[in-house]
C-alpha cells in the first residue's frame, strides 16, 4: 500500500509529496520547500516514519518545484531527477527564482539526473512509469 503525504510549500503554494510503501522506501516529488520550516517539516516526517528516501523526482523544471533540492541532497545524497527536455530550466533555477519571485538563491543546487519516457522510478515494491505531458514546460511529466 502507498502512503502519500502532501506538504504545501513556498510563496506559490506548490505541493511537495513524500510517497512511501510498507518497505519504508520513499520518493520525494516536487520538493519546493523554500523556508527552513518547510524543509524541516519534510525531514521530520521522514525521520518520524523512519523512511528511507531513494529518489528525488520533479514533474518539471520550474523553481517552485525545486527550491528544496539542495536540502534533500545534503540530507540524503539524492540528486533531482527531471525529464531531459527541462535541462535548460534546471540550469537556470537561480534566474527563475529572481525573475519569478524576486528571490536570490544563496545556495548551490545539486546537478540533476535527466531521464526520458523510458525511465522507471523504482522504490520498495512499487514503480512509477514516466508519462510525458509537455505543455506547462517542455519536460513536464506525470508519474504513474
Regions found by a protein language model. Name each.
Residues 1-49, 142-144:
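Conserved beta-strand hairpin/beta-sheet module of binuclear metal-dependent hydrolase folds
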Residues 1-3, 100-103, 124-128:
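Short Pro/Gly-enriched beta-strand edge/turn motifs at strand-loop
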Residues 7-8, 104, 110-112, 131-134:
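Short Gly/Pro-enriched turn/cap motifs at secondary-structure boundaries
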Residues 19, 30, 60, 72, ...:
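Divalent metal-coordination and catalytic microenvironments
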Residues 24, 33, 63, 86, ...:
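Short, glycine/acidic-enriched loop or turn micro-motifs at the edges of active sites
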Residues 25-27, 52-55, 126:
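Structural motif
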Residues 34-39, 43-122:
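Active-site HxH/HxHxD metal-binding segment of metal-dependent hydrolases
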Residues 120-144:
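Core dinuclear metal-dependent hydrolase active-site scaffold
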Amino acid at each position: 500500500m502507498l502512503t502519500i503525504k502532501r506538504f504545501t510549500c513556498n510563496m506559490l503554494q506548490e505541493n511537495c509529496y513524500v510517497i512511501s510503501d510498507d518497505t519504508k522506501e520513499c520518493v520525494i516529488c516536487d520538493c519546493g520547500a523554500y523556508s527552513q520550516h518547510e524543509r524541516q517539516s519534510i525531514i521530520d516526517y521522514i525521520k518520524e516514519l523512519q523512511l528511507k528516501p531513494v529518489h528525488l523526482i520533479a514533474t518539471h523544471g520550474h523553481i517552485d518545484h525545486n527550491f528544496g533540492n539542495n536540502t534533500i541532497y545534503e540530507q540524503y545524497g539524492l540528486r533531482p531527477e527531471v525529464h531531459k527536455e527541462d535541462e535548460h530550466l534546471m540550469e537556470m533555477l537561480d534566474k527563475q527564482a529572481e525573475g519569478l519571485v524576486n528571490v536570490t538563491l544563496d545556495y548551490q543546487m545539486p546537478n540533476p539526473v535527466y531521464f526520458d519516457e523510458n525511465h522507471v522510478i523504482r522504490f520498495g515494491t512499487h514503480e512509477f512509469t514516466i508519462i510525458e505531458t509537455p505543455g506547462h514546460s517542455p519536460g513536464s511529466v506525470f508519474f504513474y
